[in-house]
């Protein structure tokens, strides 16, 4: 997945809009869900702290995680009861992820992932020092296809 910084004007002021779609595709589909956010400081770096995140994108992103439950439903879940964490693939220590690397979690009962129990992690960093979020390939495809 790529991140694009598109220059736009909002209320007469130049802004860098961060999107998951390139300029041509954004012009065609005009999908608000593809806008990750805006840079707070236009001259500053693209970092978690310098982004005003788009609530529409955040909501869409986490709803896409429900698809993860569909993929996980047929897999061996490590725990029989408890929680299964959805961990960003950028994470260098997936066995002991930091809060910033945990996308969210599902409840597990008797080894079954309960789809409707997804809880988003408010500490998750969509963009970190390690770059843009990284999901399993099939989930990234679902996310991208829903945008175009």
Identify the role of each PLM range.
Residues 1-148:
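The transition from N-terminal targeting/processing segments to the mature protein
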